[in-house]
């Protein structure tokens, strides 16, 4: 910054609150401007933020095992064990407790892959 602007800034820093308010009034009168924030800007900002929220794309998905036909239970159980890394008993409990989340908060590609594998084994799956 130049020496002149540095000097003005130092002088502004040394003003009391009353002197600063008086300076603002003088600047408003001299230049025909207003220091007040426009009301329309304050109201428009939250509306713009609200409009931007629905545009966000979901990044985490849950794979939900909805149902498993009795004759496909073993095949689905094997796939669930591969996907989750659960032991035999835990995977069996999960499959029998359908509808139940198999994987939660995973990427879209991983969720679609898990859904495809479980459906190929005979289970009914949804992604949320």
From Swiss-Prot:
GO biological process, any: translation
A GO molecular-function annotation: mRNA binding
SUPFAM superfamilies, A to Z: ClpS-like (SSF54736), Ribosomal protein L7/12, oligomerisation (N-terminal) domain (SSF48300)
One CC-aspect GO term: cytosolic large ribosomal subunit
InterPro entries attached to this UniProt entry: Ribosomal_bL12, Ribosomal_bL12_C, Ribosomal_bL12_C/ClpS-like, Ribosomal_bL12_oligo, Ribosomal_bL12_oligo_N_sf
UniProt keywords, alphabetically: Ribonucleoprotein, Ribosomal protein
PANTHER family: 39S RIBOSOMAL PROTEIN L12, LARGE RIBOSOMAL SUBUNIT PROTEIN BL12M
Entry function: Forms part of the ribosomal stalk which helps the ribosome interact with GTP-bound translation factors. Is thus essential for accurate translation.
Subunit architecture: Homodimer. Part of the ribosomal stalk of the 50S ribosomal subunit. Forms a multimeric L10(L12)X complex, where L10 forms an elongated spine to which 2 to 4 L12 dimers bind in a sequential fashion. Binds GTP-bound translation factors.
Family per similarity comment: Belongs to the bacterial ribosomal protein bL12 family.
Protein name per Swiss-Prot or TrEMBL: Large ribosomal subunit protein bL12
Annotated source species: Trichormus variabilis (strain ATCC 29413 / PCC 7937)
Gene behind the chain: rplL
């Amino acid at each position: 910054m130049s020496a002149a602007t540095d000097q003005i800034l130092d002088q502004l820093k040394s003003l009391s609150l009353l002197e600063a308010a008086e300076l603002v009034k003088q600047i408003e009168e001299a230049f025909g401007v207003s220091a007040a924030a426009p009301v329309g800007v304050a109201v428009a900002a939250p509306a713009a933020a609200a409009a931007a929220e629905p545009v966000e794309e979901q990044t985490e998905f849950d794979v939900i095992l909805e149902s498993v036909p009795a004759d496909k239970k073993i095949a689905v159980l094997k796939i669930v064990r591969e996907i989750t890394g659960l032991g035999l008993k835990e995977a069996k409990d999960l499959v029998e407790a359908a509808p139940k989340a198999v994987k939660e908060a995973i990427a879209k590609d991983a969720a679609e892959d898990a859904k495809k594998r479980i459906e190929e084994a005979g289970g009914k799956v949804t992604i949320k």
